[in-house]
């Protein structure tokens, strides 16, 4: 019975996970659009130079002598001279996620890649949309193998894009990132030298519509390792600045100063002060944009124009700062070398960057607007063919007529010399089209969101009904078959919706969204008589044990709903969990005062530990590596281990357990050895000192040994439950110490002890209650009685699941993880292995939770499956909130976080299932009784 419900629940959540992508993030990609070109090109060739992970403030601000030396004030004097004398500059604003793939897609393809594209892979990421490289005559790209294949393999003609890539082994976080950039510049030099002997290559390099792409990863590598405020980060900027100056001189000589080269220098994303990126932190979303050469406007001297507090320290306020959106750069590059705009581009060409007449700017703006409008035209026509009673976007109701009117109006303005008016019309038309595209993406929202909401509601209703249906005598169970008429009545709405979806050629998943509510309603109907009987029994027990009436039960239910809503708030403001933990600290004193005052030791200990947990959820989520915190965590682990060994020496349960003090001492010694090794490696990395291979070997040895020792002794053993918890705590302690960068190890210690205390408190509280109400004692009555304590345990379990995650960070900090810990083991860039280590660190507290929860449920009489489904039901109440809180506009940090919140909450059933199975494994061969030593 439980197995079928679990399987149905997992299938439901897997299917409904896709709902947010079908509703909120319909791919913007369409094909078959007419292409538009900006016309005559001011340049024959374009140099796109991307400083991966470069922040504009670190590039342009003055630096102290300590950082940059006595001879210089600025890290990039050449690029500053370009800004002051030759080109145009500003800040390019990126979108979340601030990672290399979406950043480069926006730069080179002109649109912000849709979320569904994350399934296309991590390494090569082949893209299936148009790009500047695809429109070029030929592109020569140099850099990382994680970026370049995206555009070569996605090109309509792959031979059009040449890639020169170094291997991932060169991306060593413990070495100097300049090596990566040096490799790029050297390969370009080799290409130029080769052209002197290769006529075909020479001829190609001297043709028009040529693009050179230099991906410089050194700054990103150094930023992750040393952080942006380090000397090494600034040194890498200095190196790039010098090499760009050399490259400009080389290219001028190579092309005989023909003045046909355009240069664009920018970044795919920035970097936080903690050496991470990924979220919407302004340090991550702001990147530099400096353009110069053919077709680029010389600097405009207009004091304070575009400047704010962010750019005042750069001492460039006399130069006009022109900010753009990252996708606008693709349109700019297309204009510079006379390419067709990428057909999926939504970027609007930044006219202030162009060195041309007002008439030419108006003509370029017109072509840009028509290119964006073509996307709406094709998408609207496609929607019209598959929708019943299609309602087009009102301002574009008849697109052909609207476009013709717009085109004629702009041409008339241009011919009459009203260029500014023409440009304004183009901008307004583009904005209208973008609004129309958004309208089409939201076209089916109301219907789909209603179906999904009803799906979750019916699932929660079925879970509640199922739990109450268990609260009856087996002999009282009512088996009532559902009549054919009722089955047909239940399925009629589903059939009507299916017909509607079929006519509209809807995706297969749409049918699944409609199917599940139908199934759940039929299941609810079939068990409802037993549910009513079980609920009556529940009310009877609640009244006899606690004196609670139906009204009080409803009030408690309302309080639980309010608490779940507060958990939703706490996902966005994690300090909310501190408030919840303070409530848990006061719980025994407020609701079980008689027990708390008669068992002060355990009650006070509980309040102290849950209060300590409060501090972790108010500490900063973005952490810098702290040797002091790492030492404190390791010291606390060692003290806890020693304390337990001393404690068990005087306890009778040591004779019931096969665990020896020798084994526990050995595990504690491993922790003690781990602490200095971790501190030495971390200190060496901070000071940029080479780590001896023997030290890394010792670290790996300690890491592996910490698992070998307990696994060697755990087989065929009978452990007393406290011994099993101690072994698990000591087993994972070295891992948490080695992979901690701040207070993670301390959090692990406090959480583990708190969970152990929760287990003991619930067990003792049940014994106390059974003494007061012996008629419900498990010894006298083997029947299952659903009570308020089961609901409380489920609620606490769900709270601790969230605390285990939010205790050391939040969703945004997870997406911007710092590599300080994993590079102690793996200095070479390897996203899969490094990501696995980081995820393992996050999962360790949940392993502790599963062990404590499993042991507690065994001691309470095997209630795990009931508490499991109650926790799932609570989680899905939160999931409904997150479903409606998913954002597809506004702050791009909020968009990414809202998606993550829904996915995490929706998949809690899988996670809780994994915890349940983990607890079954972790709780094998455990004894719960004490046998005295026989003399």
Curated annotation (Swiss-Prot):
Q: What is its main location?
A: endoplasmic reticulum
Where's it found, cell-wise? Answer: Endoplasmic reticulum membrane
Q: In which pathway does it act?
A: Glycolipid biosynthesis; glycosylphosphatidylinositol-anchor biosynthesis
GO MF entries: mannose-ethanolamine phosphotransferase activity
Q: Which residues are glycosylated?
A: 86, 134, 315, 398, 925
Topology of the protein relative to the lipid bilayer: Multi-pass membrane protein
What GO biological process, any one, is recorded here?
cell wall organization
Write out the GO cellular component annotations: endoplasmic reticulum membrane
- Membrane spanning residue stretches: 6-26, 450-470, 484-503, 510-530, 548-568, 577-597, 601-621, 627-647, 664-684, 689-709, 738-758, 793-813, 836-856, 866-886, 895-915
Look at the named UniProt entry and state the broad enzyme category this protein falls under.
transferase
Task: Tell me which parts of the chain lie in the Lumenal compartment.
Answer: 27-449, 504-509, 569-576, 622-626, 685-688, 759-792, 857-865, 916-935
Q: Which InterPro entries match?
A: Alkaline_phosphatase_core_sf (IPR017850), GPI_EtnP_transferase_1 (IPR007070), GPI_EtnP_transferase_1_C (IPR017852), Phosphodiest/P_Trfase (IPR002591), PIGN_N (IPR037671)
* EC number, UniProt record: 2.-.-.-
Q: Where are the Cytoplasmic topological domains?
A: 1-5, 471-483, 531-547, 598-600, 648-663, 710-737, 814-835, 887-894
Keywords, A to Z?
Cell wall biogenesis/degradation, Endoplasmic reticulum, Glycoprotein, GPI-anchor biosynthesis, Membrane, Transferase, Transmembrane, Transmembrane helix
Tell me the function of this protein.
Answer: Ethanolamine phosphate transferase involved in glycosylphosphatidylinositol-anchor biosynthesis. Transfers ethanolamine phosphate to the first alpha-1,4-linked mannose of the glycosylphosphatidylinositol precursor of GPI-anchor.
Q: Which family does it belong to?
A: Belongs to the PIGG/PIGN/PIGO family. PIGN subfamily.
Spell out the note in the miscellaneous section: Target of the inhibitor of GPI biosynthesis YW3548/BE49385A.
What's the name of the protein?
A: GPI ethanolamine phosphate transferase 1
Q: Report the source organism.
A: Schizosaccharomyces pombe (strain 972 / ATCC 24843) (Fission yeast)
The encoding gene is its8
């Amino acid at each position: 019975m439980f197995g079928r419900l679990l399987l149905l629940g997992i299938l439901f959540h897997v299917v409904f996970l896709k709902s947010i992508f079908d509703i909120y993030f319909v791919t913007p990609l369409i094909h078959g659009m007419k292409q538009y070109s900006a016309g005559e090109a001011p340049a024959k060739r374009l140099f796109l130079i991307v400083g991966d992970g470069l922040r504009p403030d670190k590039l342009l601000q003055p630096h102290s002598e300590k950082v940059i030396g006595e001879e210089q004030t600025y890290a990039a004097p050449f690029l500053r001279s370009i800004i002051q004398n030759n080109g145009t500059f500003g800040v390019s604003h990126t979108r979340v996620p601030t990672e290399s793939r979406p950043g480069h897609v926006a730069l080179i393809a002109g649109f912000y890649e849709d979320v569904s594209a994350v399934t296309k892979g991590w390494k090569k990421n082949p893209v299936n949309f148009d790009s500047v490289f695809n429109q070029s005559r030929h592109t020569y790209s140099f850099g990382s193998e994680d970026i370049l294949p995206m555009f070569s393999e996605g090109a309509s003609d792959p031979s059009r894009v040449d890639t020169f890539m170094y291997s991932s082994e060169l991306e060593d976080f413990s070495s100097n990132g300049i090596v990566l950039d040096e490799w790029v510049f050297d390969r370009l030099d080799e290409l130029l030298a080769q052209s002197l002997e290769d006529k075909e290559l020479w001829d190609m390099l001297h043709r028009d519509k040529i693009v050179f792409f230099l991906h410089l990863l050194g700054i990103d590598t150094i930023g992750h390792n040393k952080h942006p405020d380090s000397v090494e980060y600034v040194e890498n900027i200095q190196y790039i600045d010098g090499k760009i100056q050399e490259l400009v001189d080389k290219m001028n000589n190579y092309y005989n100063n023909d003045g046909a080269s355009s240069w664009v220098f920018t970044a795919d994303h920035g970097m936080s002060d903690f050496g991470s990126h990924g979220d919407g932190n302004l340090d991550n979303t702001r990147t530099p944009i400096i353009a110069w050469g053919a077709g680029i406007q010389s600097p405009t001297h207009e004091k304070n124009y575009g400047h704010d507090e962010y750019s005042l320290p750069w001492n460039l306020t006399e130069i006009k700062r022109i900010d753009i959106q990252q996708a606008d750069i693709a349109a700019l590059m297309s204009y510079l070398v006379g390419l067709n705009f990428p057909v999926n581009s939504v970027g609007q060409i930044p006219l202030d960057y162009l060195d041309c007449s007002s008439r030419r700017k108006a003509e370029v703006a017109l072509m840009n607007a028509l290119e964006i409008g073509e996307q709406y035209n094709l998408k609207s026509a496609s929607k019209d063919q598959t929708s019943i009673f299609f309602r087009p976007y009102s301002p574009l109701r008849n697109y052909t007529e609207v476009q013709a009117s717009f085109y004629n109006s702009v041409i008339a303005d241009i011919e009459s010399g009203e260029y500014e008016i023409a440009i304004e019309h183009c901008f307004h038309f583009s904005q209208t089209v973008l609004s129309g595209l958004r309208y089409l993406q939201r076209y089916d929202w109301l219907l789909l969101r209603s179906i999904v909401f009803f799906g979750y509601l019916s699932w929660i209703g079925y879970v509640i009904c199922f739990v109450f249906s268990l609260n009856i005598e087996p002999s009282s169970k009512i088996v009532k078959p559902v009549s054919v008429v009722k089955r047909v009545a239940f399925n009629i709405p589903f059939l009507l919706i299916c017909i509607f979806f079929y006519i509209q050629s809807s995706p297969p998943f749409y049918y699944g969204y409609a199917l599940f509510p139908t199934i759940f309603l039929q299941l609810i109907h079939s068990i409802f008589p037993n549910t009513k009987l079980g609920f009556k029994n529940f009310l009877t027990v609640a009244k006899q044990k606690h004196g609670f009436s139906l009204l009080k039960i409803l009030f408690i239910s309302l309080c639980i709903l309010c608490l779940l809503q507060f958990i939703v708030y706490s996902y966005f403001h994690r300090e909310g969990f501190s408030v919840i933990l303070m409530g848990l600290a006061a719980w025994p004193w407020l609701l079980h005062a008689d027990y708390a005052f008669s068992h002060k030791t355990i009650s006070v200990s509980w309040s102290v530990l849950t209060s300590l947990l409060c501090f972790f959820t108010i500490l900063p989520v973005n952490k810098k590596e702290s040797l002091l915190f790492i030492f404190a965590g390791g010291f606390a682990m060692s003290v806890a281990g020693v304390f337990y060994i001393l404690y068990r020496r005087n306890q009778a349960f040591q004779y019931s357990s096969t665990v020896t003090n020798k084994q526990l001492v050995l595990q504690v010694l491993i922790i003690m050895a781990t602490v200095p090794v971790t501190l030495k490696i971390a200190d060496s990395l901070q000071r940029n000192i080479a780590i001896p291979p023997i030290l890394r070997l010792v670290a790996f040895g300690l890491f592996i040994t910490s698992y070998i020792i307990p696994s060697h002794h755990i087989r065929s053993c009978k452990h007393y439950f406290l011994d099993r918890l101690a072994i698990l705590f000591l087993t994972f302690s070295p891992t948490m110490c080695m992979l901690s960068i701040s207070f993670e190890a301390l959090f692990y210690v406090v959480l583990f002890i708190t969970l152990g205390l929760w287990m003991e408190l619930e067990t003792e509280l049940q014994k106390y209650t059974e003494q007061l109400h012996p008629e419900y004692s498990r010894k006298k009555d083997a029947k299952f009685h659903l009570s308020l304590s089961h609901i409380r345990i489920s609620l606490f379990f769900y709270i601790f699941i969230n605390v285990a995650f939010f205790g050391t960070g939040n969703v945004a900090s997870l997406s911007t993880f710092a590599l300080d810990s994993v590079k102690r083991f793996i200095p070479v860039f390897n996203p899969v292995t490094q990501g696995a280590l980081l995820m393992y660190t996050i999962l360790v507290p949940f392993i502790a939770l599963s062990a404590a929860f499993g042991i507690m449920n065994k001691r309470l009489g095997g209630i795990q499956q009931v508490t499991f489904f109650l926790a799932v039901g609570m989680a899905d109440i939160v999931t409904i909130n997150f479903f409606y809180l998913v954002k597809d506009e506004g702050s791009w940090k909020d968009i990414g976080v809202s998606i993550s919140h829904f996915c995490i909450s929706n998949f809690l059933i899988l996670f809780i299932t994994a915890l349940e199975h983990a607890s079954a494994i972790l709780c094998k061969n455990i004894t719960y009784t004490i046998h005295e030593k026989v003399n």
